[in-house]
A protein has these predicted regions:
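Short glycine-/acidic-enriched loop or helix-start segments at secondary-structure transitions
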Residues: 15-17, 44, 97-101
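N-terminal subdomain of nucleotide-sugar transferases
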Residues: 1-41, 48-53, 83
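A short acidic, often aromatic-flanked loop/helix-cap motif at beta-alpha or helix-coil junctions
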Residues: 42, 57-63
């Protein structure tokens, strides 16, 4: 199965869970596409079937935090079309589920 996993790249908590899940699913033969704005700290290189897709986020001086949701939705759509992803697992409701909803609506 082709699975997209969206997570934060943190070295603790959800970033660890999502990254470990991605590596375990790849080890079972699934085609995994991990999306985040930075490479997760626990992600090891050279794992067959596991590909990292960076989400480019543009910083605007107007906003305190970069507008990640639309950039993520756009990247999810690109990965879905490039890799023919069957499903996405989004590891947080906000903003990841919002981005998934936007990507599906595009």
């Amino acid at each position: 199965m082709r699975i997209g996993i969206v997570c934060y790249p943190t070295v603790g908590g959800s970033g660890v869970v999502a990254t470990e899940m991605a590596m375990a699913l790849a080890a079972r033969g699934h085609d995994i596409h991990l999306l985040s704005y930075d490479r997760p700290g626990r992600l090891r290189g050279g794992i067959p079937g596991l590909r990292f897709h960076e989400v480019a986020v543009t910083a605007y001086p107007l906003f305190r935090y970069p507008p990640y949701d639309l950039a993520l939705a756009t990247r999810m759509l690109e990965v879905r079309e490039e890799a023919k992803v069957d499903l996405f697992h989004v590891h947080y409701a906000i903003p990841h589920a919002v981005s998934a909803f936007l990507a599906r609506s595009m």
